[in-house]
From Swiss-Prot:
Main location: cytoplasm
Cofactor detail note: Binds 3 Mg(2+) ions per subunit.
Catalytic activity as recorded in UniProt: beta-D-fructose 1,6-bisphosphate + H2O = beta-D-fructose 6-phosphate + phosphate
Chain sites annotated for binding Mg(2+) 2: E100, D121, L123
UniProt protein name: Fructose-1,6-bisphosphatase, cytosolic
InterPro entries: FBPase_C_dom, FBPase_class-1, FBPase_N, FBPtase, Fructose_bisphosphatase_AS
Family: Belongs to the FBPase class 1 family.
Organism annotation: Musa acuminata
Residues reported to bind substrate: D124, G125, S126, S127, N215, Y247, Y267, K277
Entry annotated with the keyword Amino-acid biosynthesis: no
UniProt subcellular location: Cytoplasm
């Protein structure tokens, strides 16, 4: 290995170093967020290890319980939820947690409380575990006004109030994508070091894309604007080439591809799910936050996604997110329908 390659190998930007550098830019910072993030990262490493060993360790399969969404809990879901709840509480920096797996919010014991609220889906896309498809953890972080008198209202904030959001994808590699409100960066877990290394600095989504990502099995139940947009993707009338359909069925994997390559991810409302399918707090908001930070847009069919004010912790919403121009097209179709109504 030549000297230049060796220097590159040893001068690594780890996620801890990155966050400490960000912290040093804010003189008022006391390091609380850095500590919180280190516990989130630890949870991601643990779950990554468990996912990789799932088949051998008999973690695949049903655990005999059901979660608040009505789905049967898979063993890895249960384990992942326990890991993140314990990691977040033990950080001493959280006061309230909302998990996709738990019906009620978790209020942290006053002796361990900090100033942050964390919303998370510990293992999104877990129905794909058996076939080896990429799955992931999604999280968002808010700050509360008064950690000693925290209420559920602290969680029911619009997404634009988030301090940070991210996801960790467990696939051919373990990739953590993070935004602390000043751009988006991607880190890949180096198994030999046990550290997340900066591999995708300052991610920017292309302004236009050639890929659309949607479950077309629901097409017969879609509304007019969604149907028109997808038809235009497949049969463009302006001489352009049709867009390619790519749909994995794991939100983390589909959004990750959209973020890197451009295009649009759609999970619209339909007759079967008039309020949409994805949960606002720990799916729609974190992914919308990341998209906007990367130069894209996120839209619910009625408004900017991050302006939505949730009223319930497991509230659902339609979502269209991705490249700026693609989401702009969807917005124009909804506006046109509203004008003719």
């Amino acid at each position: 290995m030549d000297h230049e390659a060796e220097a590159h190998r040893t001068d690594l930007m780890t996620i801890t170093r990155y966050v400490l550098n960000e912290q040093s830019r804010h003189q008022e910072s006391r390091g609380d967020f850095t500590i919180l993030l280190s516990h989130i990262v630890l949870g991601c490493k643990f779950v990554c290890s468990a996912v990789n060993k799932a088949g051998l360790a008999k973690l695949i399969g049903l655990a005999g319980e059901t979660n608040v969404q009505g789905g049967s809990k898979r063993k890895l879901d249960v384990l992942s939820n326990e890991v993140f709840v314990k990691a977040l509480i033990s950080s001493g920096r959280t006061c309230i947690l909302v998990s996709e797996e738990d019906e009620e919010a978790t209020f942290v014991d006053p002796s361990l409380r900090g100033k942050y609220c964390v919303v998370f889906d510990p293992l999104d896309g877990s129905s794909n575990i058996d076939c080896g498809v990429s799955i992931g953890t999604i999280f968002g972080v808010y700050m509360v006004k008064d950690k000693d008198n925290v209420t559920l209202d602290e969680v029911l904030q619009p997404g634009k109030n988030m301090l940070a959001a991210g996801y960790c994808m467990y696939g051919s590699s373990c990739t953590l994508v993070l935004s602390t409100g000043s751009g988006v960066n991607g880190f890949t877990l180096d198994p030999s070091l046990g550290e997340f290394i900066l591999t995708h600095p300052d991610i920017k989504i292309p302004k236009k894309g050639k890929i659309y990502s949607v479950n077309e099995g629901n097409a017969k139940n879609w509304d007019g604007p969604t149907t028109k947009y997808v038809e235009k993707c497949k049969f463009p009338k302006d001489g352009d080439s049709p867009k390619s359909l790519r749909y994995i069925g794991s939100m983390v994997a589909d959004v990750h591809r959209t973020l890197l390559y451009g295009g649009i991810f759609l999970y619209p409302a339909d007759k079967k799910s008039p309020n949409g399918k994805l949960r606002v707090l720990y799916e729609v908001f974190p992914m919308s936050f990341l998209m906007e930070q990367a130069g894209g847009q996120a839209f619910t069919g009625k408004q900017r996604a991050l302006d939505l004010v949730p009223t319930k912790i497991h509230q659902r919403s339609p979502i269209f997110l991705g490249s700026y121009d693609e989401v702009e097209e969807i917005k124009a179709l909804y506006a046109a329908e509203e004008n003719t109504a």
